Amino acid sequence: MYDSDEADAWKRAVDLGIEREHRAQPVVLDPVGAFECKLTFFFRRPKSHYGKGGHVKASAPVCHVSKPDADNLAKLVLDRITRGGRIWRDDSQVAKLHVEKYWAITDARIGVYVSVQRFEGSEA
């Protein structure tokens, strides 16, 4: 993701979310363990996705397939989690990563939903 006003807004939102979640459910830093992380991004739909009455058109896409790229979004979030220093020492500890991008159904859903858990993977 480019260092733009939009990227800065995402960074602030991620930082606030990390702080809020940590207050609600404190986590102990694990400096060596492996983690699994799922990131689900929801973006505001453009006006062209809406028809009469403000309803989403049946032809409007579900998946967000334009910029920013999924890998850049993931890097931003993982770097912010690392910067927060509350879960892992370094985002290289993320052994499994799943990223999804969608258009939000409502503006209330816009943002990123993050799920992190310890990864007890097996050899492939």
Question: What label would you give each PLM region?
Answer:
Residues 1-124:
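Acidic, proline/glycine-enriched N-terminal capping motif
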